[in-house]
């Protein structure tokens, strides 16, 4: 333990508690964003009470006289907390202590910044010249041109000069600068920017404002730079104290984000005696300096000032928790997490489940022993002050509200916005007559055959339109698929491939998933101590695809949570005083192995994998992938697997579309193409559904088998819309409906075929018992009833089941199939539930 005073003069280690007395996570007023941002050329109104002396400046001149530290102050006060001040209210690398009490630099104060002084100004503790850095930045901004520009473009304005003019035109506040461009133009400037981001970015802002004022002196907004795309991306588990106060870039997945926290920037006080309002007081390092007396000369009452909230100026702040992505976790390791601080425009740029790449400044902050104690712990907390956020992987699809047909407030996703050349290429690709086949061949090309399964998965990627009616009824547009089959039939490989493509995709295993792990659970926030709701796999997969392996090994409590998710697409929570309904608009892709590790074709799907019928009926497509021995098929499969190990294995897929093009194609279609049913397609859907229902009628019999349910026609609509999306068509046509019926029949013939009759029977999916099996059981029960009425008296002697079986064989005129003892037991159980018989062990008695 150490007190604030004992650590205040240290020259090594993390920032001193004098500059950082509380966590920005625990105290909303202690963020670097709390430092004041002034408009260019204006000065704040001075207060009339004493302020504490500023800490040492970041900049020191060569003659050891304390020079101005305007660039550092500008960065900390002028960036709204995005890259400037550092968490916990200032502080930072002890080699570069900073001052935030000095006025913000104005681009008009060139001489004070050292621009015209003969004595160079250096960053304190380094040999970095402020004048040299400013000159290098100015040269880069004015003269940088991309390498692909030809000689005719050499006389045009540079890349970032064009960006500045666009920002002025749209009255923006940010200019994104690619760090690779800085390195290509001036590697030394890049190294200084990464090592001393606070100082260099502050000078960057000054240069930008100088250029902006040269172009348009009436422009009042403070334009700032946002750096992204560093040359090296740091792993979360490799962060160490040497990275503190340096610019870093790392990738991860958002697992929790706080609500928007209002952070005060300027405070206004009012005297309770005379009603006098003070001038705005700048919040310094998260502290509000309350006037000890009324500032009005006629009043001067002590301790009479109170904060007036509606006259204060606030800014947005958000705390985000970032977790390592699964591909970065080493063998046997657990994922690491780090806290992010987002301010102003970066707030709500990411949602839980998003995979992002963050560029920011790694900061350290002290932790007090208690809220009322100035003593601090010797262990510091770390976090990242964010400068820039972008989507991490271009190989994943976008997840920006792709299926809501009535969502007019859709956000712009930069990753799906295409240039004219790529859009023209996609338009040409969509008009090819074999685009459907090419897309299916491009999906998991290393997996041999399974063409119909791949086409079903392709429809799941494109998805249908979610329909929200004015009456409040909602119809989902997500397609759910279940893969059932023998081990070694590429089920898990297909899941892994779809997981890599899907937006916000979560991959989980049924054996390792609990009910709360899939939906949501209540936990205690380690930073604030509050009870918060943590999102589970299905909620994190909102607008994406949740892949569940080993679906048959999931616990009953976990499976029961899927009923609401797969149809209503919400998760209802009522725990620990938290009552909420969370969105889980996700497609579910699950795979299951049959019990006994081998599929028994004589049993139904439900009997093979022991899943409840109510859950199984919510899947749009159920595919059986069986391992049937066949010499010709086995030879072709072996050749395909062996060919994958050759160097030129990819050359065999000449017509396949590469994964980057495929994901961008699917993302664009999901976001921009919303097909509607044409009259011809609607008539075909109606006619086809009626034909499916007619298939359950048998000539000469009054019994009918259910071969389709209303859920099937909803599945057909979703499949038809997905097929139209593949062609970039605004209308669903008849051939889309025909292909949707074919895909549904293929899946139903595999999973819903009654092997006793050879016909499709949806009762196998909905109830687990086919209509023919139910009729057979009814016949058994009727025969046993007749025998009991003939041979047994009410309350009389009992009969053994073996005797009953012999009687059935003698009097079984209506029974055309072989009779087994387990069939007799099922029929007796049916009669016992009706109260006609009582079963006592191996005997039955009439009651």
From Swiss-Prot:
Nucleotide-binding recorded as keyword: yes
CDD domains attached to this UniProt entry: MCM4
Biased composition regions of type Low complexity, renumbered to the chain: 60-75
GO biological process: DNA replication; DNA replication initiation; pollen development
Tissue: Expressed in shoot apex and flower buds.
ZnF C4-type: positions: 271-299
Annotated family: Belongs to the MCM family.
Protein name in the entry: DNA replication licensing factor MCM4
Species: Arabidopsis thaliana (Mouse-ear cress)
Encoding gene (name): MCM4
């Amino acid at each position: 333990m150490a007190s604030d005073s004992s650590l205040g003069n240290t020259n090594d280690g993390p920032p001193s508690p004098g500059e950082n007395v509380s966590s920005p996570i625990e105290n909303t007023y202690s963020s670097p964003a709390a430092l004041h941002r002034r408009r260019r050329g204006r000065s704040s109104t001075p207060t009339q009470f004493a302020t504490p002396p500023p800490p040492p400046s970041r900049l020191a001149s060569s003659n050891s006289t304390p020079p101005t530290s305007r660039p550092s102050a500008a960065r900390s006060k002028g960036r709204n907390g995005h890259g400037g001040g550092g968490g916990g209210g200032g502080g930072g690398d002890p080699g570069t202590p900073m001052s935030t009490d000095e006025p913000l630099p104005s681009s008009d104060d060139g001489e004070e910044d050292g621009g015209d002084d003969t004595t160079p100004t250096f960053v304190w503790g380094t040999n970095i010249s402020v004048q040299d850095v400013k000159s290098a930045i100015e040269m880069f901004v004015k003269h940088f041109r991309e390498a692909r520009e030809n000689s005719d473009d050499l006389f045009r304005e540079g890349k970032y000069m064009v960006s500045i003019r666009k920002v002025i035109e749209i009255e923006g506040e940010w200019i994104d600068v690619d760090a690779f461009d800085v390195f290509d133009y001036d590697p030394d400037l890049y190294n200084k920017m990464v090592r001393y981001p606070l100082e260099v970015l502050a000078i960057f802002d000054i240069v930008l404002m100088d250029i902006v004022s040269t172009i348009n002196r009436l422009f009042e907004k403070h334009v700032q730079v946002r750096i992204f795309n560093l040359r090296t991306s740091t792993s979360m588990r490799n962060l160490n104290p040497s990275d503190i106060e340096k610019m870093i870039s790392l990738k991860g997945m958002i697992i929790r984000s706080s609500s928007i926290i209002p952070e005060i920037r300027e405070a206004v006080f009012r005297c309770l005696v005379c009603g006098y309002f003070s001038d705005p007081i700048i919040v310094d390092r998260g502290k509000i300096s309350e006037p000890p007396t009324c500032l009005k000369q006629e009043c001067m009452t002590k301790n009479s000032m109170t904060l007036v909230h509606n006259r204060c100026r606030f800014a947005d702040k958000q705390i985000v928790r970032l977790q390592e992505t699964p591909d970065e976790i080493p063998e046997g390791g657990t994922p690491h997490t780090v806290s992010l601080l987002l301010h102003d425009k970066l707030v709500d740029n990411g949602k839980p489940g998003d995979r992002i790449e963050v560029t920011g400044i790694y900061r350290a902050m002290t932790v007090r022993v208690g809220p009322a104690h100035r003593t601090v712990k010797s262990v510091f907390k770390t976090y990242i002050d964010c400068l820039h956020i972008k989507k991490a992987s271009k190989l994943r699809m976008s997840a920006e509200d792709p299926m809501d047909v009535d969502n007019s407030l859709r956000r712009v996703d930069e990753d799906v916005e295409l240039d004219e050349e790529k859009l023209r290429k996609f338009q040409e690709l969509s008009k090819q007559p074999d685009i459907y086949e090419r897309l299916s061949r491009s999906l998991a090309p290393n997996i041999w055959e399974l063409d119909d399964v791949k086409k079903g998965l392709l429809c799941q990627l494109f998805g249908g339109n979610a329909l929200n009616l004015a009456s409040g009824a909602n119809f989902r547009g997500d397609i759910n698929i279940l893969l059932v089959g023998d081990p070694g039939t590429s089920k898990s490989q297909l899941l892994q491939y779809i997981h890599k493509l899907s937006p916000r995709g979560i991959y989980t295993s049924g054996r390792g998933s609990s009910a709360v792990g899939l939906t949501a659970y209540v936990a205690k926030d380690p930073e604030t101590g509050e009870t918060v709701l943590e999102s589970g796999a299905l909620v994190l997969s909102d607008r994406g695809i949740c892949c569940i392996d080993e679906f048959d090994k999931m616990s009953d409590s976990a499976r029961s949570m899927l009923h609401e998710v797969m149809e209503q697409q919400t998760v209802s929570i009522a725990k620990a005083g938290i009552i909420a309904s969370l969105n889980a608009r996700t497609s579910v892709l699950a795979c299951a192995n049959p019990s006994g590790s081998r599929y028994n074709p004589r049993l139904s799907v439900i009997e093979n994998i022991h899943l409840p019928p109510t859950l199984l009926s919510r899947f749009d497509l159920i595919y059986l992938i069986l391992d049937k021995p066949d010499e010709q098929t086995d030879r072709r499969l072996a050749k395909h697997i062996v060919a994958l190990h050759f160097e030129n294995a990819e050359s065999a897929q000449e017509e396949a579309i590469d994964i980057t093009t495929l994901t961008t194609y699917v993302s664009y279609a999901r976001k921009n193409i919303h097909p509607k049913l044409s009259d011809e397609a609607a008539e075909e859907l109606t006619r086809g559904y009626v034909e499916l229902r007619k298939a359950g009628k048998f000539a000469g019999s009054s019994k009918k088998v259910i071969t389709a349910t209303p859920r099937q026609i909803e599945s057909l609509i979703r499949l038809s819309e997905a097929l139209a999306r593949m062609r970039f068509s605004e209308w669903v046509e008849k051939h889309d409906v025909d292909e949707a019926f074919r895909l549904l029949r293929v899946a139903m013939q595999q999973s819903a075929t009654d092997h006793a009759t050879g016909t499709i029977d949806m009762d196998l999916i909905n109830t687990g018992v086919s209509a023919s099996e139910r009729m057979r059981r009814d016949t058994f029960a009727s025969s046993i009833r007749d025998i009991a009425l003939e041979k047994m008296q009410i309350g009389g002697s009992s009969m053994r089941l073996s005797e009953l079986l012999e009687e059935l064989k003698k009097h079984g005129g209506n029974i055309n199939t072989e009779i087994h003892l387990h069939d007799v037991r099922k029929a007796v159980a049916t009669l016992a539930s009706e109260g006609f018989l009582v079963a006592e062990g191996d005997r039955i008695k009439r009651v």
